[in-house]
């Protein structure tokens, strides 16, 4: 848990640490955030980030093997989320679990 109450579940943490071991850079940087789109208005995104693209306005959370980066506008929507990971063949991958979302679409990738 960190100042902005973003929780990373053990399965997500384990998977991010395993990705980090495959990374050729010194440290793995992962950017999370929200963008306009999806059937409920906003959708989550998660992508690799270069250290040189991190600005002074970004929020940075250091873990042992990786760094999580979030812009200061997205954090308003991501406060209190849990980042989870499932290796399931159907609907597997990273999931954003947002207790503050008023509405989510059927696939869970979009919210309002």
From Swiss-Prot:
Q: Does the keyword Metal-binding apply?
A: yes
Compartment annotation: Plastid, Chloroplast
Q: Does the keyword Metal-binding apply?
A: yes
Enumerate the UniProt keywords alphabetically. Answer: Chloroplast, Iron, Metal-binding, Plastid
Q: Which Gene3D superfamilies does this one have?
A: HesB-like domain (2.60.300.12)
One cellular-component annotation, GO: chloroplast stroma
Please name the GO terms that the record assigns under molecular function.
iron-sulfur cluster binding; metal ion binding; protein-macromolecule adaptor activity
Record GO biological process: iron-sulfur cluster assembly
Read off the Pfam families from this record: Fe-S_biosyn (PF01521)
Residues where Fe cation binds: 39, 105, 107
Write out the similarity annotation: Belongs to the HesB/IscA family. Ycf83 subfamily.
Q: What is this protein called?
A: Uncharacterized protein ycf83
Q: Which organism is it from?
A: Galdieria sulphuraria (Red alga)
Question: Which gene codes for it?
Answer: ycf83
């Amino acid at each position: 848990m960190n100042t902005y109450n973003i929780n990373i579940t053990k399965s997500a943490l384990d998977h991010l640490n395993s990705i980090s071991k495959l990374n050729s850079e010194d440290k793995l940087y992962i950017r999370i955030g929200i963008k306009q789109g999806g059937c409920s208005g906003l959708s989550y995104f998660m992508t690799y980030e270069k250290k040189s693209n991190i600005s002074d306005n970004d929020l940075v959370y250091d873990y042992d093997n990786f760094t999580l980066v979030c812009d200061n506008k997205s954090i308003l929507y991501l406060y209190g989320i849990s980042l989870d990971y499932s290796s399931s063949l159907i609907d597997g991958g990273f999931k954003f679990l947002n207790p503050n979302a008023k509405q989510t679409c059927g696939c869970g990738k979009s919210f309002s």
